Design a protein with these regions (language model features):
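Aromatic-rich carbohydrate-recognition surfaces in CAZymes
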Residues: 1-24, 48-52, 56, 171-193, ...
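Extended glycan-interaction surfaces of carbohydrate-active proteins
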Residues: 11-47, 86-172, 205-231, 248-254, ...
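Well-ordered alpha-helical scaffold segments within catalytic/enzyme domains
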Residues: 53-72, 119-130, 178-190, 248-257
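Short alpha-helical "patches" and their helix-cap loops
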Residues: 129-143, 194-201, 256-273
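Alpha-helical scaffold segments in carbohydrate-active enzymes
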Residues: 1-12, 54, 61-64, 79-94, ...
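Internal metal/ion-chelating core segments
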Residues: 31-69, 74-89
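Beta-rich accessory regions
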Residues: 72-79, 83-88, 95, 185-195, ...
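Catalytic cores of secreted or luminal carbohydrate-active enzymes
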Residues: 233-274
Length: 315
């Protein structure tokens, strides 16, 4: 129902989606002419690359749910995916920047480089060679890579604020780094996902050690919490920032992916690491520990305890 509502009420004639800063969650990102339109409350007459990618992702998930439930696929969703992927890869992609961009009302790419284009990874819109270019941008300290993770606005863009990030004018957000890391892994770029996750998780952990809390956003230039209008963002913000020290730590730093009756473990760390007394959805209580290694070439030694049998695949 929500997907249909968005399709009926938040699309342009070509089927691409629009929103506002508050609507898309990136409150004050300067993606439009802010001398004419409110970044927070207006669509600026542009096609939002992030919302368009999210709707592709949502449509694909709805089709997957239909398959699991054994019900007929909605052909309109299949048609929408095909149409939007065509626009994304023919119009939103910029070969010069190696990024996906918003489109203006004439169908031209908006030059502002922001984090929204990386939703192409999670939505599986980017072909392999473009996914690799996106991964390169994510590792580039001159644009998106920061000590805390991924800048919401590329360094050097008009409106970028190096001191605290001023929310979405450069600030690093756990929720967007989670989407990006999961997107990289979904595209098979596990090493890139692990490296970004390590940088982000370690930064969030360091700030927690320094301040005793998890923050709403993080600084784009140094390892500390973010700011909004010169003041600290909200502390104790586990509501979505908790995804980093929990889910990202387990899945992309430790490298554990849990499926029913099975754990796939992509071991990347040299330190002794793992989880003890984890209750799986089927009630099985497991402990998985990888012992310390001296090098990446050394074969991992893994100890597993569980209440009942399950499979562990080590990669």
């Amino acid at each position: 129902a929500y997907h249909d509502w968005m399709r009926k009420n938040r699309t342009w004639k070509d089927g691409t989606y629009f929103s506002s800063g508050w609507g898309c969650g990136m409150d004050n990102i300067p993606r439009m002419d802010t001398t004419r339109y409110s970044a927070e409350f207006h669509h600026g007459f542009i096609s939002f690359v992030d919302v368009t990618m999210q709707q592709i992702f949502n449509a694909k998930n709805l089709l997957a749910i239909a398959d699991l439930a054994g019900i007929a696929r909605d052909k309109s969703l299949e048609d929408e995916i095909a149409a939007l992927e065509k626009i994304a890869n023919e119009k939103m992609w910029d070969e010069a920047t190696g990024l996906y961009h918003d489109l203006d009302r004439e169908g031209n790419r908006v030059s502002v480089r922001h984090i929204g284009g990386f939703w192409a990874l999670l939505a599986r819109v980017a072909p392999p060679e473009r996914a690799r270019r996106l991964a390169s941008s994510l590792a580039d300290g001159a644009t998106f890579a920061s000590p805390c993770g991924t800048r919401s606005l590329a360094k050097g863009e008009d409106g970028y604020e190096r001191d605290g990030g001023n929310y979405w004018r450069g600030g690093v957000w756990c929720i967007t780094d989670w989407a990006i890391v999961r997107g990289l892994a979904g595209c098979g770029l596990y090493e890139d996902a692990h490296k970004l996750a390590m940088r982000h998780v370690c930064a969030v952990a360091k700030v927690y050690a320094d301040t005793g809390t998890v923050w709403e956003s993080y600084d784009p230039e140094k390892v500390t919490h973010g700011k909004l209008y010169g003041q600290s963002v909200r502390r104790d913000f586990v509501g979505f920032s908790g995804v980093t020290p929990i889910a990202m730590l387990v899945r992309d730093v430790f490298g554990m992916e849990f499926t029913p009756g099975k754990v796939v473990w992509r071991v990347r760390l040299l330190e002794r690491h793992g989880i003890e007394n984890l209750t799986l959805p089927d009630g099985n209580v497991v402990s998985l520990i990888c012992e310390k290694r001296s090098s990446l070439s050394e074969k991992p030694v893994i100890k597993v305890l569980s209440d009942k049998p399950f499979k562990v695949e080590v990669k």
